[in-house]
Amino acid sequence: NSITYNFENINSNVDNGNQSKNISDLSYTDQKEILEKIVSYIVDISLYDIENTALNAAEQLLSDNSVDEKTLKKRAQSLKKLSSIMERYAGGKRNDKKAKKYDTQDVVGYIMHGISTINKEMKNQNENVPEHVQHNAEANVEHDAEENVEHDAEENVEHDAEENAEENVEENVEEVEENVEENVEENVEENVEENVEENVEENVEEVEENVEENVEENVEENVEENVEENVEENVEENVEENVEENVEEYDEENVEEVEENVEENVEENVEENVEENVEENVEENVEENVEEYDEENVEEHNGI
């Protein structure tokens, strides 16, 4: 299938009375003879070249984005079969003319079947062409007729519109001139009255807005000035009052602290004096008692 796909699109230069023809235009016998020669040349090349030829053909044929997956699978199967046949020719059966002949005939048979199938499809397409041509011609006639009708209708409408427009313009110009004069007089009077009323209203609104703005500005300025004056006065008064209060509080606190300190000092001095007096008295009494005791003992001893 892969090979027939290529034969459909390739022109083969065949020496037939010095004329170049497409292989698909030849008779069945001529096609078979040419293909047998081609396959015979293929099976005589080396195994390395066969592998590269099959690989390159597979890459080109299987990378065609215009076919579906089913067609690609069929191509792959055909390439696989052709590759296996080529490998046998390159192996031990290279000189086996009988096997070569039968294998060549098998390959050519597959190719010829594909070509005949393509020819049938092309014949069917050619037979269906007149029907399509007639159908397309009728469709085009209807389409062109509709377009021409629409086009003529548009042109007629535009032409009539232009003529009517010119007539209407002349009539309208006269009416417009008359209406303009009347409207000018009426509009002058109305505009004068309206402008007077509008100007009065606008002036009143502007005066009211200016009054409000001035009142707000004056209020803000007065508030700021009063606040500053009141702050200064309050600061001075508060400072004086706080100084006097702090002085009085400080004097009272100091007097209380002095009294407390005096009481504490008196108590401490009394305790210290008592302790000192006790110690002194004890020492003096001890000394006196010792002296008295010694004198008494001396007297008793002498009396004995």
Curated annotation (Swiss-Prot):
Residues 142-159 have a biased composition (Basic and acidic residues). Glycans are attached at residues 18, 22. The keyword Amino-acid biosynthesis does not apply. It is a peripheral membrane protein. Transmembrane segments: none annotated. GO terms for cellular component: plasma membrane. Its main location: membrane. It is found in: Cell membrane. The keyword Oxidoreductase does not apply. It comes from the Eukaryota. Keywords: Cell membrane, Glycoprotein, Malaria, Membrane, Repeat. Residues 160-298 have a biased composition (Acidic residues). Residues 142-304 are annotated as: Disordered. Pfam families: DnaJ-X. May disrupt the normal intermolecular interactions of the cytoplasmic domain of band 3 and thereby facilitate the invagination of the red cell membrane which is necessary for the formation of the parasitophorous vacuole. PANTHER family: DNAJ HEAT SHOCK N-TERMINAL DOMAIN-CONTAINING PROTEIN, DNAJ HEAT SHOCK N-TERMINAL DOMAIN-CONTAINING PROTEIN-RELATED. This is Ring-infected erythrocyte surface antigen. It comes from Plasmodium falciparum (isolate Palo Alto / Uganda). The lineage of its organism: Eukaryota, Sar, Alveolata, Apicomplexa, Aconoidasida.
